[in-house]
Amino acid sequence: MSDYKKTLNLPQTAFPMKANLAQREPEAIKKWEAANACAAMVEASGSEGTYILHDGPPYANGHLHMGHALNKILKDIIVKSRNMAGYASWYVPGWDCHGLPIEHKVEQDLKEKKKSLPAHVVRKLCREYANKWLDVQRKEFKRLGVLGDWDHPYISMDPAYEAVTAGELAKFVAAGGVARAKKPIYWCCSCHTALAEAEVEYNDHTSPSVYVRFALPDEGLKKVFAAADPARAHVVIWTTTPWTLPDNMAVCLHPEFTYALVEAEGSQYILAEELVASCAETFGWSEYTILDRATGERLEGLKARHPFYDRQSSLVLGLHVTLDAGTGCVHTAPGHGREDYDVALKYGLEIYSPMDDAGRFLPAVEFFAGLNVFEANPKVVEKLEEVGALLQKGKIRHSYPHCWRCKEPVIFRATTQWFISMEKNDLRTRALKAIDEEVRWIPAWGRERIHNMVEFRPDWCISRQRQWGVPILALLCEDCGEAWNDPAWMQEIAARFAKHPTGCDYWYEAELKDVVPEGLACPHCGGNHWKRETDILDVWFDSGTSFAAVLEKRPELGFPADLYLEGSDQHRGWFHSSLLVSEGTRGCAPYRAVLTHGYVVDGDGRKMSKSVGNVIAPQELIEKFGAEIVRLWVSSVEYREDIRLSDEILGRLVDAYRRIRNTCRFIMGNLSDITAHDLLSLDRLQPLDRFALDVAGRVHERVQQAYMDFDFHKVYHTLHNYCVTDLSSVYLDILKDRLYASAPHSDERRSAQTALWHILCLLLRDMAPVLSFTAEEIFSHLPESLRGPETTVFALPPLAAAPYLLDEGTRDDWNVLLAVRGAVTKAIEPMRREGIIGHSLDTRITLFVADELRQRLEGLHTDLRAVCIVSQLHLEALDRAPQAAYRDEEVAGLAIGVEKARGEKCERCWIYSTELGSDASHPALCPRCTAVIKGMES
C-alpha cells in the first residue's frame, strides 16, 4: 500500500496547541511595551472619532483584589473594542493617593512618634508609602493584559493635580458655595476625624434601648389638658443612644400628631395616641386611662426638666417625628443629629457637644467626664435609674453606621467644619437635573439610586482633621477664631503648589508670612494674628476633581468623558463627588454615561472575606490559569450583578478557551501555504464558502454591537458558540476533505483557504479586546505574506461585515440545507450504534424531497454529498420514499434513506467510489485523488 498520507495537505502551523498562558503572557507584555502597543492602537484608530473612558482611581494601598481585576479588565475591553472599531481612545490610568488608610498605615509604623513629628515629615512618609504600592499595582494591572499610558498615569498627589484640586475649591468659594459652621457630622472616635456619607458603612450593631421620662412641671400644661397635674406629669422619649442624653436640649413633637395625656401607676404621661397601647405593653402597665388629647402644635413651648441636670428641656416641633417606633416624642440633642440641629436653629437652642476628638466627655460634663461615649452608655442608664427617670431598658439589634476604614461604630458630633452648600447656587437642583436628563445610567436603576442620594443628602462636609491630603486654604484668626479666605489668594497659593517639588507640602513648609497677605486684618474682629487652617479636604473632593486635573489638562483626552465605569458603591462615592464638583464649577456633569458593575463573590454567592477564608487573589489565578482565563471570565458573566468566581467556574472556562484556541489553530494550520496573491475574490468563492462568510459577517456584527452595548457576555457566548458549532462542528468539518485532499493550488482549495483567511481576520478583531494575549499570539503567527504593516493586533483597522453578507433568501436556503444535514446525521445514527458503519462516509444517502425543497437545495449549486459528509447522495421524489425512510419533523417535505456506501473506500480520502482503480497506476484511489496525485507527479 502506498503512503498516500504524505500527499495530503495536512495542517501546519507553529501556533502551539498548548497555550501555556502563565508562561507566555509575560512575553506578550514585553512585546507590547517594546512596540508601544497602546500608542500604536490609538494612532491606527480615529476614523469614527474619539471615545474617552475616564479611569476612576484605585487607592494606592495593598495588592490588587478581584474587584480591581474585574474593573480594569472591563475598562480594557471597552478601550480596545472602541479603538478597533475606529474610535481613538486613550486609556490614562489613575491613582488616589491621599487619605486615611495610608496615613493610618504610617501611624502604625510610627506609633507614638507621629505625635511629635511635623506634618510635612508625616506627609513625606505617606507619599513614599503610596508610591511603593502604586508601582506594585501598576505591575499587577499590566500583568492582566491591560493596555494604557502606564508611564504617564494621573496621580492625585502630583503637584499639578493638587494645585487643580485646591483651585477647584477656590471656585466654590468664589461662588459663595463654601461655609464654615458648627454642625453635627459623622465622626469616627477611633480615627479622630469627620467622615463623609461615602465613608460610612452600615453594619448590624447592638445598642441599648431606653425609655426615659422628663418631668413636665409647667403650669401651662393645664391650658392644654384640663385634667393635667403638672406635679405628676411627664413626657416620654425613646433612644438607642443614652450617651447623648447629657446633651439633651429639647423634646420634639410633630405639630399634627394627636398626643394623649395618660394616667398610669400614679403618674401622668404624654405619648402619641397611636403608640399608647404598644408603650403600655412595653412599660408593663396593666391599667391606664387616656385623660385627654391634643395636637402637638398646642404643646409647643412647654418646659420640661432634664432628667439629671438642673435645666429645662423645651417642647418643640419638627416634621421629622414619626410614629414608626418609640413614643412620638423625640429626644433632641442638637450636637448629635441633623434633624435635631435643624430644629435647634429654628428655636435658638445651643448646639451642645462637649467631647474631644476621641469621643470622650470633657471635664465640664457632670457625672460622665472622661468617659468615651460608648463607655458612658451604661453609666447614663444607671443615672436614669438612680433618679427614677427610666421607664424601660433593653437591647436592640439594628443597622448602625461604622467607619469605612477602622470598622468601628461612628457617632454624630457637632464640630466646626467646612461645608459645600447643596442649596447655594441651586447645586442640588442642578445636579438632579443632570442625573435625570444629561446622563445615561447603565444599568438604568443607577439613575434612581444616585438621584435619591443627591436629593436627600445634607450639605457636603469637605473637611477632615488629618494630615495626608490637600489642605483647605484658609487662615484662622487667633483673636476671634473666625476663618478667612479669598478666591484669588487661594488660586495664587494653588499655583505655588504646582511649582513646588512636593505640591501642597508647600502649605506646611512655607513660613507663615509667605502665605498671609501683607497687612491682612480680620474682617470679624480687626485682629492680625493668623494661623494656617490644618484641616485637609475630603479625599472624595480630591478624586472628584479628576475631570479638571486630567480630562481638561491632557490634550489626548477631553471633557466631559464619554464613560465613567466603577463598582455600584461609587454612586455614593466617585460618581457622586465628581458630579457635584463638575456641576458646581462647570454647570454640567463630567460624564455622558455611567456604567456600574457588581461585586465579586465566591462560587456560593458569599461575599469574599479573610475571616471566612474564601478570598481569591488575582495573582493566584494568573499563576494557575493565566490572565487570559480571568479576562474570559470577566467577559462571560453578567457583570452588572454580583459575579461568582471559583476554580470550578474557571475550569469550565478553560475548556471553552481550549475550544476557541483549537478552532483558530485549525484555521491557521490550513493557511500555511497561501500567499496574498493566492487569495480569491469573493465572487469566485464556492457557494459554501460564501455562506460561511455570511455567517462570519453576521457573527461579527453581533459581536461588535455587543461591544458597543457593553454586553460582553454576549461577545463571549456568541464567539464560543460560533467556534464550537458553526465552525468546528459544521463548516470546518465539511471543509476537511476539500482542504486535505484537493490539489494544493486548486480553486476549490484556494476558495476554502480564502474564506478561512477572512474568517480569521474577523475572529481576530472580535477576540482581541477580550482574549488579548491569544489574539496577539495568533497575529504573530500569521503567514508573513498575509500580514500587513501593523505591529500589534490592536492596530488592525476595522472590518465591515457588509461585503460578506448574502441576501436573506439565499441565507434561508442554506439554513434549510443545514437542517437537512442535521436530519441526515440523525438518520445515520442507528446504523452507527449497531456497528454496521463506523463513519458517515461509510453511507449512501437518498434524499426523498418535495418539489419545493428540491428547488431550494439545487438552487444552492453546492455539493450536497460533501455538505452531509457521506460517500454518495442522490435526490428522489418524496412520493417514492419507502415506509421505513427516516422522517424529521423539523424539516418538511423530506424523507431519508440510508444504506451502506457502494464501491470501495479510497485509501487517500476515505470516500467510497464505484470507480476505484480506474487508473492502474493507483488502484486504491478514486478518480479525484488519482488526478490530484498525477498533478503532483507532473
Swiss-Prot record:
Q: Which Gene Ontology BP terms does the record give?
A: isoleucyl-tRNA aminoacylation
One Pfam family this chain carries? Answer: tRNA-synt_1
Task: Write out the residue ranges of the motif 'KMSKS' region.
Answer: 607-611
Q: What is this protein called?
A: Isoleucine--tRNA ligase
The protein's gene is named ileS
Q: Which residues bind ATP?
A: K610
The UniProt note on the cofactor reads as follows: Binds 1 zinc ion per subunit.
Q: Where does L-isoleucyl-5'-AMP bind?
A: E566
